């Protein structure tokens, strides 16, 4: 009987299930979108019960599509939207409030209060994170302080907290297992990434009872088994990692200096720094890459706010293209950018500049500038921003970038990938299987149940669809980068400060 690994990929807009075979190839995919709830401006919520229902539904669907029985699943891996916060009553299994999503800004004011007290330095030292409403800690506090009766229940030990991974595992095991992994714990702003435990001082500052928190385990180990009611048989739940860390693992970035970039609406860059937690001087996050083989490995993380979103803007607002795919054709119809730079700082600019008052700008326009040059400049902006973050990572870690592995929608754009390689001066590798997030969770589960022997075996699975090698002369590259940096300085400090 042939065996497979099931991966539950619980994202921000949809719940998916992907089944993989021994070669790391996709056997079947099932996906369902769920409701985005916006109670007020800047607030974002999900219904945890809807997420669980849809996630269980797609698991059954993926088995049907693949025409395999639950007995053929050797293990289940879970990967999830990180930071999103669920608090539920352990006696009833019911959430006391909707899940507060990572994008939600409702606790920004409270974060400012903590910053005024200098707590941000303590948080950075212990958790590797910047004090921000993005992470789970202030979301938990908000629920305890604003939902009627929540704090009393928590003090009595009746409430549980979890990110989406914990919530899914709790439901899959019918409330037997309350657990998370090191990668998800490292995004709560409550976990000491050096001592590998929940931090008592931070819990005290935020007034969060420790009894609410899940047990923290490696990313690859058997946490428990699914309740038989789910599939008719018990299946080991054996892998768990936050989505970006799962993608790093799925891209087989197992050694220090290996990095991946996910080109989505924004871009997420992670670089493996090995067993060393690197403190960033450039405003990057220090995070846990994976907990495996009796140890944890660390990563530096940088995000770019506007990646593929700049292409959506060209399509929807400027109406320069009908589809995102057309941008490649237009960009290659001109020899170069003709001196045109586009800085997509629509919502400010992130690492390593960190200027929330920057705004988008197009510079270097002359009478010879055409639509094609603007489209090309938009694509190039993704590569320049990636370059800036990776250079900051190299500087922080003292580790030289060896190659960049890519995934996400925009990695299908060959012009962009070639330009990325030219600007970085390293090889850019696009894999055969671009579902690297789900694949990473599958690998973590498969290793724990012995489906794959070790990381070497997995590395042999990793197949390149296309590799892009740098082909630009150094002088030209330096000139382009200099032009980009000049453009960024013009975009900065534009919006009036209140």
UniProtKB/Swiss-Prot annotation:
Binding-site residues for ATP, renumbered to this chain: 12-14, 265, 308, 312, 409
Cellular component annotations (GO), alphabetically ordered: cytosol
Annotated TM spans: none
Protein origin, superkingdom: Bacteria
Binding site for glycerol: 82-83, 134, 243-244
Positions that bind ADP: 12, 16, 265, 308, 409, 413
Catalytic reaction list: glycerol + ATP = sn-glycerol 3-phosphate + ADP + H(+)
Activity control: Activated by phosphorylation and inhibited by fructose 1,6-bisphosphate (FBP).
Annotated GO MF terms: ATP binding; glycerol kinase activity
Oligomer status and interactors: Homotetramer and homodimer (in equilibrium).
Biological role stated in the UniProt entry: Key enzyme in the regulation of glycerol uptake and metabolism. Catalyzes the phosphorylation of glycerol to yield sn-glycerol 3-phosphate.
Name of the protein in question: Glycerol kinase
Natural source organism: Clostridium botulinum (strain Hall / ATCC 3502 / NCTC 13319 / Type A)
Organism taxonomic ancestry: Bacteria, Bacillati, Bacillota, Clostridia, Eubacteriales
Gene: glpK
